[in-house]
């Protein structure tokens, strides 16, 4: 499975199309990590799955009357992906609360936004974070802010997990 990972478009819907155009093949889904949900309207009539979470600047949703969740846990084959914007877990001050929340969900990948800073870090099984002990390795990723031309890609297959960064 291949995913385009976007966050923090902040009104730059045009950059969503540009990031999609750079992909070698159509992703299985767009994972949107908040702050610009209304920008996803550019994908409304395209045949592409969109999985959004709400950010601190998302006062309106993609579809009237619906609200995007603050967290989404995706199960893809043997993998679990936890998506969040991160503002409710204080990610600008550190990742401890977000990783502890993830440890409870037992996810393999934690995707977040909010800081606008690209990040990729592997945490080992057995690490203690905010009182939680990770039961398995965890890949923590932030694609950076799409408004700054940054995005991510996530590939999951039977050989493992690969996260990459892209720029416009």
Q: What do these predicted regions represent?
A:
Residues 49-92:
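Helix-adjacent hinge/juxtasegments
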Residues 15-22, 83, 88-102:
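Pre-active-site segment of Zn-dependent metallo-hydrolases
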Residues 1-50, 65-69, 158-159:
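N-terminal active-site segment of His-dependent metallophosphoesterases
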Residues 17-18, 76-77, 100, 105, ...:
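Binuclear metal-dependent phosphoesterase catalytic core
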Residues 10-15, 37-41, 57-62, 88-94, ...:
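Active-site environment of divalent metal-dependent phosphoester hydrolases
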Residues 5-7, 29-35, 51-56, 82-85, ...:
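Active-site neighborhood of phospho(di)ester-bond hydrolases with catalytic His/Asp-centered motifs
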Residues 42, 64-66, 71-74, 101-102, ...:
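Short secondary-structure boundary/capping segments
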Residues 2, 49-51, 80, 139, ...:
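Conserved beta-strand segments of alpha/beta enzyme cores
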């Amino acid at each position: 499975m291949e995913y385009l990972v976007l966050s923090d478009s902040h009104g730059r819907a045009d950059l969503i199309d540009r990031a999609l155009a750079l992909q070698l093949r159509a992703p299985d889904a767009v994972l949107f990590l908040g702050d610009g949900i209304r920008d996803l309207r550019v994908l409304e009539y395209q045949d592409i799955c969109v999985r959004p979470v709400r950010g601190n600047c998302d006062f309106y949703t993609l579809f009237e009357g619906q609200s995007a969740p603050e967290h989404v846990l995706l199960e893809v084959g043997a993998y679990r992906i936890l998506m969040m914007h991160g503002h409710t877990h204080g990610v600008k001050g550190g990742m401890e609360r977000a990783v502890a929340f993830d440890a409870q969900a037992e996810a393999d990948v934690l995707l977040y936004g909010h800081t606008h800073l690209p990040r990729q870090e592997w945490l080992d099984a057995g690490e203690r974070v905010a009182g939680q002990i990770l039961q398995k390795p965890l890949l923590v990723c932030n694609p950076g802010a799409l408004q700054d031309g940054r995005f991510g890609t996530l590939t999951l297959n039977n050989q493992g997990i690969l996260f990459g960064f892209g720029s416009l």
